[in-house]
């Protein structure tokens, strides 16, 4: 039977998300059915300068070849683009040995840092159920991913007065 679910949410630190999930039979008898899910999110963070955009998609088609055998074909895609990405943490002490006491939102990441990640996955599989409860599965998968990062990891202990030394 046809089913659909949609949601929109907003939260702290400009966190906005929307999702749509639709499942439907493609034939009257329901032997062929499909599902599609899409998600988008745009959010900031308690961490200074950090923000992230995310898009994801999932599609699946299932076909009942026999009452005991199902063929599945699907594809999923995910694109995540964070900015203001940290690579490491913040120093806990100044060069004179005193505690920095920075706020928990303190980040050493400049706004030009990023760590983009995209992944795609396509698959086809078959499952057969036997009368004794056993199942036989076979799946072929093709995965691709790409990552592109521009990061900075300052090290050292900054001078309390000038901030230099990292």
What are these regions (language model features)?
Residues 1-59, 65-69, 120:
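Outer-membrane beta-barrel translocator/receptor signature
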Residues 41-45, 58-64, 68-129, 133-135, ...:
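Acidic/polar loop-and-plug regions of large Gram-negative outer-membrane beta-barrel proteins
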